[in-house]
Curated annotation (Swiss-Prot):
Residues 1-200 are annotated as: Hydrophilic. One of its GO terms (cellular component) is Cul3-RING ubiquitin ligase complex. PANTHER family: GH16156P, PARTNER OF PAIRED, ISOFORM B-RELATED. Keywords: DNA damage, DNA repair, Phosphoprotein. Disruption phenotype: Mutants with mutations in the RAD7, RAD14, RAD16, and RAD23 genes show partial incision defectiveness. Component of the global genome repair (GGR) complex composed of at least ABF1, RAD7 and RAD16. Interacts with ELC1. This is DNA repair protein RAD7. GO terms for biological process: global genome nucleotide-excision repair; nucleotide-excision repair, DNA damage recognition; protein localization; response to UV; ubiquitin-dependent protein catabolic process. The modification Phosphoserine is found at S64, S85. Residues 115-127 have a biased composition (Polar residues). Component of the global genome repair (GGR) complex which promotes global genome nucleotide excision repair (GG-NER) which removes DNA damage from nontranscribing DNA. This protein is one of 10 proteins (RAD1, 2,3,4,7,10,14, 16,23 and MMS19) involved in excision repair of DNA damaged with UV light, bulky adducts, or cross-linking agents. To S.pombe SpCC613.14. InterPro entries: Leu-rich_rpt_Cys-con_subtyp, LRR_dom_sf.
Length: 565
């Protein structure tokens, strides 16, 4: 039953009426009223009008100056859009307000020191002002050119485009990806396929370049059911789509029908892949041996079971990531039906998987070569015992070992697993132990001193926070120094300059030194001299690396603070 409450009577002088009543009460007590403020405003406006009469003479020059600045800025924006790699839709999003903000807004302190451009019109009252206006115009043009050059350089660095001159092949693929939407409309109007359009213009796209075209289309978010017809070729054996978010379930079925000889298929961000499409792929692709799926969250346990039954005896490589519906039961069905034929397995960010202890029981293939277990939902699900048992089964033939985000691993896995079961002359090509913050320098130094890694190509210790100089030095004293092409030492805060004195790898092309405190200009110069094929160094968070760093030709720094726009 509703019960009325005792409420204060309205109309009281000190009554609290709302969140602004206290302020209103204060203004009333101090004698501050809206009428007084209004009168003062009128007085200021009348004074401004009197001063404005003296500036009418220079108004025409002011308008021409402002118009010229706007024209230069608009030309700059148009040039930037014309030379960029975005789609037509992205280009159309550049608004008038965004273009006008380019003049007063900039992060370069040097520009503010050389020229202070006011947002208000410049008044010209004498010949000296005209000369000053000319100088300001010149400075404005230089500033705009510098901004355009910086934006282009920064965009190239972030996209890791280190080659200034693109090949004709890459230019053609870029042009296709940029104009694919327009060609699709023209093809719809003329009832012709997009592939026929490309064949008429360029003579078609070779099978070897289809994967490059797929990367370009995925980057521009232009891969859909219509552009998918470019890849419907009967002689296609391998196909990788980096972004399938716009491909419907019918598109996957069409791909399976018109490309029946596919043996390797990688579908990233395949959120629309449903039960029917997955089973259709299994039935219509009899030669399929390798399947990589990212984000197939529509597939349930029953469908996974049917799929693995169909693929029994022929599935050799299976990688899955980012789905909560791949459960322990699904993993069990995979291992029971296909475990004996698997030579490569990848499990990443699977929130419903906890029983990783099943793996050592079923991965018994003598040719097993790739194991990737990344970011388990519970850190204790992947522990030293499980990995040691796994290495006891497959360590002899392992070529790729990725254990990123398995933060429960300790030195025991390194000593009793890697060192014990990997042969002295092992075929290991990829080793990644990212975010294993319990692994120390001593265990890795012992491992590198006992096992020769003559085939190691890629190595990553990102965020292994306890690693110091001796672990890296021991790696470089190993046979790996002659084969390494990619090395990731991101966030190894314990490293000093001594570790980089020994970093001389003839085939090293990529090095990540982000957030390594000791890296400065002298280290960059030394690394460039000691590694002749090094082309890219990531230096994000290394504030000691400045624009004064001496770099040899062909070496590019990405993430340097002085290169930011």
């Amino acid at each position: 039953m509703y019960r009325s409450r005792n409420r204060p009577k309205r109309g009281g002088e000190n009554e609290v009426k709302g969140p602004n009543s206290a302020l209103t009460q204060f203004l009333r007590e101090e004698g501050i009223s809206a009428e007084n403020i209004k009168q003062k405003w009128y007085q200021r406006q009348s004074k401004k009008q009197e001063d404005a009469t003296d500036e009418k003479k220079g108004k025409a020059e002011d308008d021409s100056f402002t118009a010229e600045i706007s024209r230069v800025v608009e030309d700059e924006e148009i040039d930037e859009i014309g030379t960029g790699s975005g789609t037509e839709t992205e280009r159309a999003q550049v608004s008038y307000d965004a273009r006008m903000k380019l003049v007063p807004a900039d992060s370069d302190e040097e520009e503010y020191e050389t020229s202070h451009i006011s947002d208000t019109p410049v008044s010209l009252s004498s010949a000296n002002d005209r000369e000053s206006l000319t100088k300001k115009r010149q400075n404005t043009a230089k500033i705009i050119q510098n901004r355009r050059r910086k934006r282009k350089r920064a965009a190239d660095l972030l996209d890791r485009r280190v080659n200034k001159v693109s090949s004709l092949q890459s230019l053609c693929i870029t042009k296709i990806s940029e104009n694919i939407s327009k060609w699709q409309k023209e093809a719809d109007e003329s009832s012709k396929l997009v592939f026929n359009k490309l064949r008429d213009v360029l003579g078609g796209v070779s099978t070897a370049n289809l994967n490059n075209l797929a990367k370009a289309l995925s980057k521009n978010r232009a891969l859909n059911d219509h552009t998918l017809q470019l890849f419907l070729k009967t002689d296609l054996k391998r196909l990788t789509f980096s972004d399938c978010s716009k491909i419907s379930f019918d598109g996957y079925k069409t791909l399976a029908i018109f490309s029946p000889h596919l043996t390797e298929l990688s579908l990233q961000m395949c959120g629309q892949l449903n039960h029917e499409s997955l089973l259709y792929i299994a039935e219509k692709l009899p030669n399929l041996k390798s399947l990589n799926l990212d984000g197939p969250f529509l597939i349930n346990e029953d469908t996974w079971e049917k799929f693995f039954v169909i693929m029994k005896g022929r599935l050799e490589e299976f990688h899955i990531s980012n789905t909560h519906r791949f459960t322990d039961k699904s993993l069990s069905n995979l291992l029971i039906n296909c475990g004996s034929t698997l030579v490569s397995l990848g499990l990443s960010r699977l929130d419903s998987i906890s029983n990783y202890a099943l793996l050592p029981q079923y991965l018994v293939n003598d040719e097993f070569h790739s194991l990737c277990i990344e970011y388990p939902f519970n850190e204790e699900d992947v522990n030293d015992e499980i990995i040691i048992n796994l290495l006891g089964q497959i360590g002899r033939t392992l070529r790729k070992l990725v254990l990123n985000g398995c933060i429960d691993l300790t030195d025991s896995m390194i000593i009793n697993g890697l060192t014990a079961f990997i042969p002295e002359k092992c075929p290991l090509e990829v080793l990644s132990l990212e975010e294993s913050d319990q692994i120390t320098t001593d265990s890795l130094s012992y491992f590198f001193s006992k096992v020769e890694l003559n085939n190691l190509i890629e190595c990553s210790f990102r965020r292994c926070l306890q690693l110091g100089d001796m672990a890296i030095i021991e790696l470089l004293l190993n046979g790996a120094r002659d084969s390494l092409r990619s090395l990731n030492l991101n966030s190894l805060k314990e490293l000093t300059k001594e570790a980089f004195v020994a970093l001389a790898c003839p085939n090293l092309t990529y090095l990540d030194l982000g957030f390594v405190r000791c890296v400065d200009d002298s280290v960059i110069q030394m690394l460039g001299e000691q590694n002749p094929n090094l082309t890219v160094i990531d230096v994000f968070g290394d504030n000691l690396v400045t624009e004064k760093a001496t770099m040899r030709p062909g070496l590019t720094l990405i993430g340097r603070q002085s290169d930011s726009i």
